[in-house]
């Protein structure tokens, strides 16, 4: 029987941030990945601000540059060290999606793979000698893009940092979108509720995917998320955009393309009718007191 490889404890958040930012500064975004993000509705400016970067074909030059800067990869999920040399636990083609905590620190990264059944996975080195396991974390986005969570703004909750970023940008950057890794991340959601309560948030909008209509497991998981929020005095309301579009990002992308119109579209002229939606109107959730 194969023995389990020793796994290191993760560095403190501020040290993870230092390493991840140093790594991302050495990487670039391939044209095909930039085009993928632009098709999702993001501008070049927004893509650059959120530090999306492509997986390098070779890590050797990255590690050589960072070694000169004294960067250590011990205790950093996604990396491991063997015989004094650093290695990345993944080399499949894709791009990195940084996860930012409430203090604007990068504390983890997901990879969006170009191919495969599972397109999104945590960048983790669990299972490697002196590797480090990635834990489920919530992403709050970066201040230059995502409004700060506090009691004065309506907070939305969805799954996936990329989806949250797109929804925030395409809806006008008016409200913060927090991203869980998935609807089953109950411990992660409880930690998030502790934070939300501490900054005066008492109500959040559930912007999880519309597949709840056909998936009982998703519905049951959402019920548990609602129950956890209630324990912290936080109520939740569903943002219901129907089932034509699976994710809130898909919905807002359709809005930006004119495939569906938001309600209360002003008339261009006094005697001109407001444009008719291709699909039914989906109401905004009003901000609660």
Residues covered by each model-derived region:
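Short, small/acidic-rich helices and loops at N termini and domain boundaries
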Residues: 1, 28-95, 250-286
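Generic alpha-helical secondary structure signal
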Residues: 14, 18, 31-35, 45, ...
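Generic secondary-structure boundary/loop-capping signal
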Residues: 21-24, 39, 44, 49, ...
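Conserved short loop/turn motifs at secondary-structure junctions
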Residues: 21-25, 51-55, 213
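TOPRIM fold recognition
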Residues: 119, 149-155, 161-289
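Conserved active-site segments centered on acidic
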Residues: 1-36
């Amino acid at each position: 029987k194969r023995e389990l490889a020793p796994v290191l404890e993760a560095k403190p958040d501020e040290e993870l941030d230092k390493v991840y930012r140093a790594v991302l500064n050495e990487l670039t975004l391939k044209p095909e990945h930039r085009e993928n993000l632009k098709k999702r509705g993001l501008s070049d400016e927004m893509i650059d601000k959120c530090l999306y970067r492509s997986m390098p074909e070779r890590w050797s030059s990255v590690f050589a540059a960072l070694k000169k800067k004294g960067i250590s990869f011990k205790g950093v999920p996604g990396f491991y060290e063997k015989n004094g040399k650093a290695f990345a636990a993944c080399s499949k083609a894709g791009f990195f999606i940084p996860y930012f905590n409430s203090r604007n620190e990068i504390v983890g990264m997901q990879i969006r793979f170009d191919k495969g059944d599972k397109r999104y996975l945590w960048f983790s080195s669990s299972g490697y000698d002196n590797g480090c396991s990635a834990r489920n974390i919530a992403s709050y986005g970066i201040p230059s893009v995502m409004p700060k969570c506090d009691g004065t703004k309506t907070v939305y909750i969805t799954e996936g940092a990329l989806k949250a970023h797109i929804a925030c940008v395409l809806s006008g950057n008016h409200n913060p979108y927090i991203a869980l890794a998935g609807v089953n991340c109950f411990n992660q959601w409880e930690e998030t509720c502790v934070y939300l309560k501490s900054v005066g948030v008492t109500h959040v909008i559930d912007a999880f995917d519309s597949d709840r209509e056909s998936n009982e497991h998703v519905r049951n998981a959402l019920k548990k998320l609602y129950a956890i929020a209630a324990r912290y005095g936080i109520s939740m309301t569903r943002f219901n955009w129907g089932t034509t579009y699976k994710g809130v990002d898909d919905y807002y992308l359709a809005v930006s393309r004119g495939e569906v119109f938001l309600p209360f579209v002003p008339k261009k002229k006094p005697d001109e009718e407001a444009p008719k939606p291709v699909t039914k109107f989906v109401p905004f959730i009003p901000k609660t007191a």
